[in-house]
A protein has these predicted regions:
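Terminal amphipathic helices with adjacent charged low-complexity linkers/tails
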Residues: 1-17
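Intrinsic-disorder/low-complexity coil detector
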Residues: 18-19, 54, 170, 191
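Active-site diphosphate/adenylate-binding microenvironment
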Residues: 21-103
Length: 198
């Protein structure tokens, strides 16, 4: 049932020994990612924790990658008009600017942007606008070393990964080395923002 699936997703951890959910060409990537970046936290476990910890009247926004699917499956809104998800076109880069506009519309309610690292890299310039205008938005950045959802779509069709994972180039000329470790909290240094990480 849904409650059992929610508990499974909410408690999921990952390491290099976790068996893949789908056995395809991408099966070893998640374990390698956990090893290279020293992380066992899954997106679903992070979403469960965020959902429990934020104010019950907070408004969340998202739009691209695997977050819309995971949030549709897992997110438990506690008040009306608190869930804003762009499903139609998976508009990468919308999450930060959308959160700024949303915060301007909802006033005192806390606003949380759920954004993947690929989308954040594409367009996070409105973070500076939020600072300039003294508009508080909360950015929850999910790092899956690039464009994980697009990578899953590529490899799920039997293709090799085509630069959708942020990996170092090896002597072969391919981007199949270890994963890059990007300090996304460091991106906001020099801006008067508060940085937290898990």
């Amino acid at each position: 049932d849904w409650e059992a699936e929610l508990a499974r997703l909410d408690g999921m951890v990952y390491d290099q020994n976790t068996p893949p959910l789908i056995n395809d060409r991408n099966a070893e990537s998640a374990g390698q990612y956990a090893l290279d970046l020293g992380s066992a936290l899954t997106q679903t476990a992070a979403l469960g924790a965020i959902n429990r910890l934020i104010p019950k009247d907070a408004v969340v926004i998202g739009s691209s990658g695997s977050l819309p699917g995971d949030m549709q499956r897992m997110w438990r809104p506690y008040s009306p008009d608190s869930y804003n998800m762009e499903y139609g076109y998976s508009c990468m880069g919308y999450e930060v600017s959308g959160a700024l506009g949303q915060k301007m519309a909802v006033g005192e309610k806390e606003t949380y942007s759920m954004v993947g690292d690929g989308s954040f890299v594409m367009l996070h310039s409105e973070l500076l606008t939020a600072v300039q205008e003294k508009i508080k938005i909360n950015i929850c950045l999910f790092d899956n070393a690039g464009f994980g959802c697009i990578n899953n779509l590529q490899t799920g069709q039997g293709n090799d990964s085509l630069c959708t994972e942020l990996r170092y180039r090896t002597a072969t000329g391919k981007h199949d080395g270890s994963f890059l470790h990007v300090d996304y909290r460091g991106v906001s240094k020099g801006r008067p923002v508060r940085r937290l990480g898990v």
